[in-house]
Amino acid sequence: MTSVEELRACALLQDCADQLSVLGNIIRPGAETQQRTELHLKTAQLMAGSSLSNFSGELKSQKHFKIQQTLLASDNLAKVQKDRQFVSDVINALLEELQKKNNFQSLFSAVAEERKKKAELLDIINREEEGRRQIKKLQKQLLDIRKEKTEECERLEEEVAILKDQVQDMRVRTNQQGKFVKSCAEQLVYQESKHNSYKENELEDEVKMLQEKIEEEKNVHFETEAFLKQQHANLKQKLQYWIHRYEKDMEEKEQEITALQNKRNSSQTRIQDLSKKCKDMENVVIEDRIEKEHLRAQMEKEQREKNAATKIQAWWRGTLVRKGPRSKKADKSKKKDGKKGKKKRK
């Protein structure tokens, strides 16, 4: 970059920095903001150099229109101030680097940093999607666990009902058997006592044997009933345990879902903020590119005008050089003709 181009670029950047500084001073919350904005913008325009006024006129009008629209809302003042400060820092760093090193490396660094922030934003979005998939997976697991526990509870209830029915059937069967055996024994004793007396002892032994069997059946019945009651108590205890465990698992899963939802909401808020910042940075880069394009066009125009002026000056000098001897000869011939005319008159 030549020294003239460097000076022009520095002047343009200084003009932008001054305007941003003035813009930062005029951003005030309250009823006077809208009235002061136009006055400060006019002051910033008067501070710019006359040589760059035509080039930056369109850009100033666009900024003036955007600022008038944005500053009317009090909620956007902080955001505008932050964006203005970022643009001012980028322009000041670029101006300082241009003056010292005659390059635009800081601008490239700012663009690279914004790209890095955009990559981080995409990473956050990917993590958010992974969190959503994890939530869906946990919800599916919770539904499966709930279904499994419900089926197990129903199965245990069916087993308890079956055991109750078995106990009742055994109790009825035992009572019927006892009554039947007793009636049979009495009938046999009565018949045997009538028909044959010598069989009395045998029948008594048989009655005793039957009574022992009845007692044994009763003992078996009592033991079976106690065993079934114990099994019923154990199953009931297991049922209470599984119900408690089911409620505990449900509470833990709900806490995990709540934590994931809170994390998702926080990530969404951060993503929205980063999206706004990314859009603002893209607008800043676009405006900077437009400024560079305008500066390049202005420099090409000035170079063409300079070349044209040089050609015109060279052509004019050549014309003067060619016409110089001819004008001297014409003056001498005019003088001779004047002398001859005077002699004839005499």
From Swiss-Prot:
Description of the deletion phenotype: Morpholino knockdown of the protein leads to a severe reduction in the size of the caudal hematopoietic tissue at 72 hpf, a strong reduction in the number of myb-positive hematopoietic stem cells, and results in impaired definitive hematopoiesis. Contrary to wild-type, the expression of monocyte, macrophage and lymphoblast markers is strongly reduced. Likewise, hemoglobin levels are strongly reduced, suggesting impaired erythropoiesis.
Q: Which GO terms describe its biological process?
A: cilium organization; definitive hemopoiesis; sperm axoneme assembly
Segments forming a coiled coil: none
Q: Would I find Cytoplasm among this entry's keywords? A: yes
- Please tell me in which tissues this protein is expressed: Detected in adult testis, and at lower levels in brain, kidney and ovary.
**Keyword terms:** Calmodulin-binding, Cell projection, Cilium, Cytoplasm, Cytoskeleton, Differentiation, Flagellum
Q: Name one GO cellular component term.
A: motile cilium
Primary location: cytoplasm
Keyword field contains Cytoplasm:
yes
- Function, please? Component of the nexin-dynein regulatory complex (N-DRC), a key regulator of ciliary/flagellar motility which maintains the alignment and integrity of the distal axoneme and regulates microtubule sliding in motile axonemes. Binds calmodulin when cellular Ca(2+) levels are low and thereby contributes to the regulation of calcium and calmodulin-dependent protein kinase IV (camk4) activity; contributes to the regulation of camk4 signaling cascades. Plays a role in the regulation of definitive hematopoiesis via its effects on camk4.
Q: How does it assemble?
A: Component of the nexin-dynein regulatory complex (N-DRC). Interacts (via IQ domain) with calmodulin when calcium levels are low. Does not interact with calmodulin in the presence of Ca(2+). Interacts with hsp70 and may form a complex with camk4 and hsp70.
The protein's name in its UniProt record: Dynein regulatory complex protein 9
